[in-house]
From Swiss-Prot:
Species annotation: Trichodesmium erythraeum (strain IMS101)
Signal peptide: none
Chain spans, region Disordered: 1-64
Biased amino acid composition, Basic and acidic residues: 11-20
Protein's UniProt name: Protein GrpE
Biological role: Participates actively in the response to hyperosmotic and heat shock by preventing the aggregation of stress-denatured proteins, in association with DnaK and GrpE. It is the nucleotide exchange factor for DnaK and may function as a thermosensor. Unfolded proteins bind initially to DnaJ; upon interaction with the DnaJ-bound protein, DnaK hydrolyzes its bound ATP, resulting in the formation of a stable complex. GrpE releases ADP from DnaK; ATP binding to DnaK triggers the release of the substrate protein, thus completing the reaction cycle.
Pfam families registered for this protein in UniProt: GrpE (PF01025)
Family from the record: Belongs to the GrpE family.
Length: 242
């Protein structure tokens, strides 16, 4: 026991006997250790602050990116709608132009056809009196000898060629006899009271009529049946001389 107390006293004495230089060094070491701890603490705080700033910056950057992406999407959507509208307008214009051109083509074609028909009608109308003369000659002239028969056949051959030419042009002859009178086709130049035909029936063609397609070149001049005069028939039946 006495030995342990002696050892402790010896250590305390050694400590007390340290030189001022040693004490100063130890003090400096302790100060530097304290400074290092404080520096490490500040560094940790700085690192934490930097991490927070980085996270905040990243979050802000993401938000900006999202805003920019949304704006870009909306811009593209607007451009798409505008392009779609312009495309529809162009398609509509194309259809209108196509319809206008088609109408123009049809109108031009119809005008051309009408002009061709008008010229054709005018030319044929000039030939119809010649046809009439040939038909009158055929009806009234009766060849009396071989010479006259040869002449008759010669001009009848010309007449036939003209009729065939008219047929090729689309001209057709009216056959009104026995039909009901139609003012669109016929011209009544004579009327005859008769009980043999219904009233309004064409009983004779006096001048031939012609049609080109659906157009009347010349109305047929006809004689039309009318109802008999019953009073005149009664007088004839009661006349003593009959």
């Amino acid at each position: 026991m006495a030995g342990e107390n002696s050892s402790t006293e010896t250590k305390n004495q050694e400590i007390n006997e340290k030189t001022p230089e040693v004490q100063t060094f130890e003090t400096n070491v302790e100060f530097e250790s304290s400074q290092k701890v404080e520096s490490d603490t500040e560094l940790s705080a700085d690192n934490a602050s930097i991490d927070t700033d980085i996270q905040s910056t990243e979050s802000t950057s993401k938000e900006k990116d999202q805003v920019l992406l949304k704006e870009a999407y909306e811009l593209l959507q607007t451009q798409l709608e505008t392009t779609k509208y312009q495309l529809e307008e162009k398609e509509s214009q194309y259809k209108r132009l196509g319809a206008d051109f088609d109408n123009f083509r049809k109108r031009t074609q119809k005008e051309k056809e009408d002009l061709d028909t008008q010229v054709k009608c005018s030319t044929i109308m000039e030939l119809l009196p010649v046809i009439d003369n040939f038909e009158r000659a055929r009806s009234h002239i009766k060849p009396a000898n071989d010479g006259e028969m040869a002449i008759h056949k010669s001009y009848q051959s010309v007449y036939k060629q003209m009729v065939d030419s008219l047929k090729r042009l689309g001209v057709s002859v009216m056959r009104p006899e026995g039909q009901e009178f139609d003012p669109n086709l016929h011209e009544a130049v004579m009327r005859e009271a008769t009980a043999e035909h219904p009233e309004g029936t064409v009983i004779e063609e006096l001048v031939r009529g012609y049609i080109l397609g659906e157009r009347v070149l010349r109305h047929a001049m006809v004689k039309v049946a009318t109802a008999p005069d019953t009073d005149a028939e009664t007088e004839n039946q009661t006349d003593p001389e009959s």
